[in-house]
Amino acid sequence: AALGLPALAQHDHHSEGEAPLWSQADEIWGEEVMEESRNVLVHHHGRMATDAVEIHRFELQSGEDEDVVLLDGDVWYGGDINKLVVKTEAEYSLDHREFEEIEVQALWSHAISPYLDVQAGIRHDFEPDGLSHAVLGLEGMLPYRFDMDGAFFLSEEGDLTAGVELEYELMLTQRLHILPRAELGWSAQDIPERGIGEGFTNGQLGVRLAYDVVREFAPFVGVEWQGSLGETENILSAAGEDTEQTVFVIGFHAWY
C-alpha cells in the first residue's frame, strides 16, 4: 500500500488546482528552461520528420518461358502522422530486353490509427500504356501482424481497378525468416485494350526464405505462382496467351 502513496499524492496535488504535473518542474528550473525541454521531448516523440528508402523486392523471376527482373520499393519523408510516399514497381524482361511495366505513385499518407495509413495521390504508368490514375488506398499492419497494401485506381479514361498485397513474416531464428505473400487484382469493367476482364483479374501466391545478413539487408530465395483469373483468364486464353506460370525467385530486401 505504501508504494501507491506517491502516486496518490501527485493526483491529490494536481486535483487541488495547482500547477499541472507537466509543469511542476517550472518552479525549480524556470518556465523558460522547461518549455524548451518540453519542446525537445515533443519533437522526438512525433513531430520530428524522418525519411526512409526501402526495396521490398529486387529479384530475378525465372519461369519456363521468360526471365524477368522485378523492382518493388518506396521512399518516404515525414512524421508519425503525415508523410510523402513515392512507390515504384518495374518489370524488365531479360528475353525481350525491354521494360514490360513501370509504374510510379506519389502519395500523401495520413495515419488514421497506430497501425493503418490512408493514402491518396496519383499513379503514372510509364509502361505499357502511359496512363495516369487517381489513387486512394490503405497501408499498414492488420491483426495477427499481416502487412497490407491495397488501393483503388481510377484511370484518366474512367476505368476503375484495384489491387491488394498481403505479406506475413514468420521468424524461424533471429535472422532466418519465411515470407508468405499474396496479391490480388480486380477491375470494375472490361478493358479490352489491356486484356483485362471484369471482376478478379490476376493473383499471385508465393513464399520466400530470407536471411538477415544485417538488419538492413536480407537476400532470399523462393517460389511464386502467378495466374490470370475469371474473365481476364478467358480473354487471354482466347488470344492464345499463357494464363498461369510458376517462377523461382532469387533476390534481396533492403532498407536505409
Where are these regions (language model features)?
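Outer-membrane beta-barrel initiation region
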Residues: 8-98, 102, 106-110, 248
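Hydrophobic, lipid-facing positions within transmembrane beta-strands of outer-membrane proteins
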Residues: 51, 69-73, 102-106, 132-136, ...
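Residue-level signature of outer-membrane beta-barrel architecture
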Residues: 77-79, 110, 124, 140, ...
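Repeated loop/turn-to-beta-strand initiation elements of outer-membrane beta-barrel proteins
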Residues: 81-86, 114-118, 144-148, 173-178, ...
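Detector for outer-membrane/organellar transmembrane beta-barrel domains
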Residues: 131-192
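Outer-membrane beta-barrel "beta-signal"
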Residues: 207-212, 242-256
